[in-house]
């Protein structure tokens, strides 16, 4: 039986996956720029996080739980990488465009231990950490492996990188009165708070509830709304140009016809 608390990550996975596939399909069909493609990939990373979280909440053994904890970390790294790529191109951050390969290198080095290495320095599967969460009147128990020092460093590095993303977004909207209503500004700050909360909870620093999947859902929804306006605007502009070109072609043909008739007179 599926635990009640896994409903939220299942919803997150479904919505994010559908949006990611739709945006990528639309991008490839219309050859829309890589901003949309990178966000589509970020949405698929959120889908992977939702799937791994739902499975973690329903794990019956510590070994099984650890597998999905690793998937969670990998999906978060992939999300941060693709979302950072999206932000630097959306805001046109020239410096980070040039040195984005550094982010790719760090991401690959961070992913490798969680995929290939079984060691207490990564995850200590001999120790467990229990979280009791009350969800709609039902007490849920989440059993997890204790993160090793390398994983703790990964958590810290992830928070630092996303803090950098958040700072760049805040700087871009500095002085704008309507910044709190802008989807990019609002969603990035919400997710940063959720990421810090979950990282501190995963390290055992605070006793809270995991809210990262909710933060992911809000970000995906808000940024998808932002991109939908941009995409529809681009499509409308393209259609307007096509109509204008058609009108010019008709005018050209009429002008050529008039000139021809006068030369024959």
Place the predicted regions along the sequence by residue.
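Interfacial "cap-and-anchor" motif at the non-cytosolic start of specific transmembrane alpha-helices
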Residues: 2, 9, 33-36, 40-41, ...
């Amino acid at each position: 039986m599926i635990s009640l608390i896994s409903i939220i990550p299942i919803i997150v996975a479904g919505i994010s996956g559908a949006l990611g596939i739709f945006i990528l399909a639309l991008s490839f069909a219309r050859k829309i720029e890589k901003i949309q493609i990178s966000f589509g990939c970020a949405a698929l990373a959120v889908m992977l996080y939702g799937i791994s979280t739902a499975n973690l909440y329903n794990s019956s053994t510590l070994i099984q739980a650890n597998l999905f904890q690793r998937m969670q970390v990998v999906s978060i790294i992939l999300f941060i990488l693709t979302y950072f790529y999206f932000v630097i191109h959306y805001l046109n951050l020239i410096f980070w465009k040039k040195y984005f390969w550094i982010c790719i290198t760090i991401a690959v080095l961070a992913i490798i231990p969680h995929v290939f290495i079984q060691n207490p320095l990564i995850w200590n599967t001999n120790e467990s950490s229990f979280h009791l969460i009350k969800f709609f009147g039902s007490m849920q128990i989440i059993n997890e492996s204790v993160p090793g020092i390398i994983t703790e460093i990964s958590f810290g590095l992830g928070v630092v990188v996303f803090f950098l993303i958040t700072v760049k977004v805040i700087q871009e909207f500095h002085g704008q009165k309507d910044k709190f209503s802008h989807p990019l500004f609002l969603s990035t700050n919400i997710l940063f708070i959720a990421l810090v909360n979950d990282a501190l909870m995963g390290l055992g620093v605070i006793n809270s509830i995991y809210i990262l999947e909710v933060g992911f859902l809000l970000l995906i929804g808000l940024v998808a709304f932002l991109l939908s306006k941009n995409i529809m605007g681009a499509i409308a502009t393209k259609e307007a140009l096509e109509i204008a070109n058609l009108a010019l072609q008709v005018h050209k043909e009429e002008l050529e016809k008039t000139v021809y008739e006068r030369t024959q007179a």
